[in-house]
């Protein structure tokens, strides 16, 4: 399966005219996403305000990427798990069966943060819990008839490294 960079699908213009076979993005497109930022802390049922992006924004990026039916979405900075949440919702809406790979360092949340106060030992733990909640919520909603209804995920934890410290 070939990887297609988002840059090959990215469209940018304000005059509604396609260029070089690419679709046009209106200049006012981002206004709605800007408004979403005010409610982003509430998304996913997880209290984590630092760095969250709106699910709707990530779903729009998925559409622009022209994913194939069984596309793979990779996020090297998983954080609260917004990308996986968006993939689940997008699959439920359009019937595709995208999968996701999230990567997150074993980062400890700030002791003063809501995430730490709710008992999450790491950001990865928080992300996994969000995926459980998001999957359950997606399955409770209306789903595309062609979708396989797969909201499962696996966690691979790297326990130790064979890399020598170089600093």
Task: Describe each PLM feature range.
Residues 1-72, 94, 107-110:
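Class I S-adenosyl-L-methionine
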Residues 3-5, 9, 102, 123, ...:
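Intrinsically disordered, low-complexity regions
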Residues 30, 101-103, 156:
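Hydrophobic/aromatic beta-strand patches that form the interior of the parallel beta-sheet core
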Residues 113, 117-167:
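SAM-dependent methyltransferase catalytic region
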